[in-house]
């Protein structure tokens, strides 16, 4: 096996090396520059993961595959060019590269695996060449600065019809990734499905209009859209509604609220809603007050995850299905009020560090331990 070392911040990869092994430079915080010789054909999983000082990497045209997590967590990396020789960009390959502003995916790349560029929060634009025929789940999820998405004309699998700033799977009319440009998104009327995380952390997005042809919306499709203040579902949509002008997407048949927003700081859930879906209010950072009606019997995981301004919650008596992480990462919660006969139930279902906040309706504010 070739011997690898770092000299003056530069990775020394001997000429003749065919593969950079898994985790070869994992966590090397002193590494700033990587120049890969043209003998290398594969970059292993986690090869440069968590190299937090890495600012520059040159990927030669000999590389055919970039492994899973190869550059994940390289938070100082600002740009990368994926050459035409690369056929596969692995799962989470550049996950969490928060300083990455420019990505060039060259014509010749065929597959971008799940979460390959997840959390690249400085990325502003994406161009998908016509050679890319496979895009995994949440590839560009949580890319909060994204304002431009273009798919090359002639791509046989994907398109960005009507200049919609989105990636759409042509055959199924599924919108798999969208963005705000700068504050609104127009979903083409031909779209029938929105994939999970499609608009995750589009922090500039202020309003969403769901056309009547959209009959499937994936989990957390709009999670972390912290500027979102208006949600409207078109009349006559057979699956979803936004009843009572409630600024939410509700699954009509099950009365499940799957996405809400803060407008601007408080939200009243309609009294007909019986379930609050996974991640329904996740990342609604400005939300300070939530009114949950007595009709609600189920609160799913991450329902209010990361609602960092939320202070007071009143929970109803009828809840029988409650997941422990429903209010995870709500650091400013002062009180969780519950009916007398449900206090013990909620204390059993909340994490230990939050149980002191749960008090009976009408009680004084609890004192944090």
Locations of regions flagged by a protein language model:
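Structural signature of tandem-repeat unit edges
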Residues: 1-19, 29-42, 52-65, 75-88, ...
